[in-house]
């Protein structure tokens, strides 16, 4: 039985659920979950939670992500990426656009921006996923959503090929950002139909691509009983939360039993959520929140045994 977080390199062609399914067979355990869907055609780091670490998956998903994305100007598609049918084309050559113009437009997308999620996505409208409407050739109004782009900049030269223009960007963003929609919107700002032609996630929830393991590597490590050495502790997935050190053994016992407390037990005023940590082992004991109906009280959200 494993308890911890494992950064997995998801290969192209696999769904996030495929990764979980394969790991359940290899590790012979059911309590495994991923931390946010990566589309099949996207590769990169996918943090996987094992055992008790599944309790912190929501918090890992809230952390930032970084991508390398190839943007192609000159063609738009039904899915906003390279897998869709072509919607519109417009020839692009060196006289139409330059690197300075592209860089100036990219800067306009930093900060909080509005996005309309793509039709081929799992966003729900009226109880149905958008891709269900798309597959039935139905139209539906898609609500705008605010997302956060911490940084976006170009990391390649601008190249021209077969009446299209290509350049790669690095994007650091918050939860819920659609990079293919970002690519399409960048194209619109530049005056051309566009789509995302390749995507790799290089960081997610504090985990880097360089430290990610392939499924084959995980299998080999498990068979040699050395996978434990590659696991990140549960605490790593909660590093963005305020923590309180607990020394008193009776207080520790009450926390582990899931008791509620008056806020005065805390050394300072907090907003939700926060964690109690065993001062001797530095292991997280529980995640607590302010009681929604009793603002003077704190209650457990997740307890770790």
Curated annotation (Swiss-Prot):
- Describe the reaction catalysed, as an equation: uridine(55) in tRNA = pseudouridine(55) in tRNA
Cysteine pairs bridged by disulfides in the record:
none
Asked whether the keyword Isomerase is assigned, the reply is: yes
Q: Which GO terms describe its molecular function?
A: RNA binding; tRNA pseudouridine(55) synthase activity
Which GO biological process categories is it annotated with? Answer: mRNA pseudouridine synthesis; tRNA pseudouridine synthesis
| Cited CDD domains | PseudoU_synth_EcTruB (cd02573)
Q: Which family does it belong to?
A: Belongs to the pseudouridine synthase TruB family. Type 1 subfamily.
Protein name (Swiss-Prot/TrEMBL) = tRNA pseudouridine synthase B
Protein species of origin: Staphylococcus epidermidis (strain ATCC 35984 / DSM 28319 / BCRC 17069 / CCUG 31568 / BM 3577 / RP62A)
